[in-house]
Amino acid sequence: MSSLKERKEAFVSGLEGGSILEINVVTSIALTSYLCANLISYNDTQNIPLGIDFVLNWVAMLLSFTLYSQDIYLLTTLCLIPSIGWFLLNYKRNLKQSKNTVKHTTKEAVQKFELTKKPFLTAYRSGMLILTCLAILAVDFQIFPRRFAKVETWGTSLMDLGVGSFVFSNGIVSSRGLFREKMKDKKDKASSIKKIFAATRSGTTLLILGLSRLFFVKNLEYQEHVTEYGVHWNFFITLSLLPPVLVLIDPITSYIPQCILAMLFSTVYQLFLIKDDSLLTYLVLSDRNTFINANREGLISFVGYCSIFLWGQTIGFFILGNKKTTNNLYKCSVTVSRDKKNRTLWDRLTTVGPSLGLLIWFIITYALSEGLYLIHPQTVSRRFANMPYVLWVVCYNTAFLLCYSLVDKLFGNSSNFYRISTLLEAMNCNGLAMFLISNVSTGLVNMCIPTIDQNDKVSIVILLIYAAFLAMVSFSLYKHKIFIKL
């Protein structure tokens, strides 16, 4: 009879995923929750009550890929109807508030470029983090549909998208550092050596976490899925290596934009995958008799994650600032665009606001994705982070960020009128720390409970307690102004 460890490993192995359409529909519940929160709080300067906040942003997300995975439209309706009803009941006050909001937002007269916090970006990042933290435990229960778990090699799934989205989000955040460096005087700018040292130091913490996870997995009989990253590799190690590796190409980005480098990395890698079957044969079938062979998935997929990270930086160039800057569609610029008459056609085309920039990049990456499939119909592979996977992740995230930004436009939210629910703000402030806590919590639950043997009722109770625990921890850290930077 198989051991519990072997049964759990078999439970997450050999999976083929589901459709991209279903993944889009399921994850749209986070967007629906953000819309509902704005409907409920539209006539009030205070945030929505914590109980409603938790139901919308944690419980609804959990239900979307468990109990309501087959009835996602019903769940969406259950969220929307009460929210719209509340909004309509307070219509007169909402109308008055709308006029006040317009007056408030038209007073923006800041001419200097500054980095600002955008409600839609906080909502997007927090929603993605919540989904990721919930899914890493839920996947170990029978209540979590197997089509949402990570695929073995080829295909798309909810969790495969979550991994890439996490890297993409980190890329957006990292572009803040590029802006800060641009805004410094020449004498205050860090040297290349200092940048490399700082990037290595920031990655060291994550590397220690990755090695710690490896130690506990190997010594506590925790289930392993070797084809995910390899024998010794894990996602924390990938995250730890991104900053020090990508800081090495910073000097190049002065001449070649991040988006071009991202495409170059993906294209060259993809050509190796499709032109010569020997590489693909090695990746899929080779023995794991050396360190490189044992961890080939983690090593080879790093190219794809570098590309995703660079795409995230590109998006950050036009969504993080308070003003449109020249050529911000593709480069880090702090030059505020003012004189429209004297701008060249190229400057006019590549100087964009958040919504337009997101729309442009969505169209471009979607067209590239479709064109690539026509040239060579290799499907998505998160295991190898191939070009179809990279373009899928970028296309999805730009589309959803665009939808979030449109919600902000609809309700008059901006950096000057920053309105976001407390639990989303709390999650955003300690995102990486909460991801670590969720990983540790998942391990503890798995060691204490045979998750694979629990029925649906017990499973959902455990997952709700887990969700409440994570929400409480993030809220407590936020309330006490504890911001953990890893």
UniProtKB/Swiss-Prot annotation:
Location(s), subcellular: Endoplasmic reticulum membrane
Pathway: Glycolipid biosynthesis; glycosylphosphatidylinositol-anchor biosynthesis
GO BP, sorted A to Z: GPI anchor biosynthetic process; protein localization to plasma membrane
UniProtKB keywords: Acyltransferase, Endoplasmic reticulum, Glycoprotein, GPI-anchor biosynthesis, Membrane, Transferase, Transmembrane, Transmembrane helix
Bilayer topology term: Multi-pass membrane protein
GO cellular component, one term: endoplasmic reticulum membrane
EC number: 2.3.-.-
Glycosylated position list: N43, N342, N413
Superkingdom of this protein's organism: Eukaryota
Catalytic EC class: transferase
Membrane-spanning intervals of the chain: 20-42, 48-68, 71-91, 119-139, 153-173, 197-216, 229-249, 254-274, 299-319, 355-375, 387-407, 432-452, 458-478
Major location category of this protein: endoplasmic reticulum
GO molecular function terms noted in the UniProt entry: glucosaminyl-phosphatidylinositol O-acyltransferase activity
Short name of any one Pfam family annotated for the protein: GWT1
Protein family membership: Belongs to the PIGW family.
Function: Probable acetyltransferase, which acetylates the inositol ring of phosphatidylinositol during biosynthesis of GPI-anchor.
Protein name per Swiss-Prot or TrEMBL: GPI-anchored wall transfer protein 1
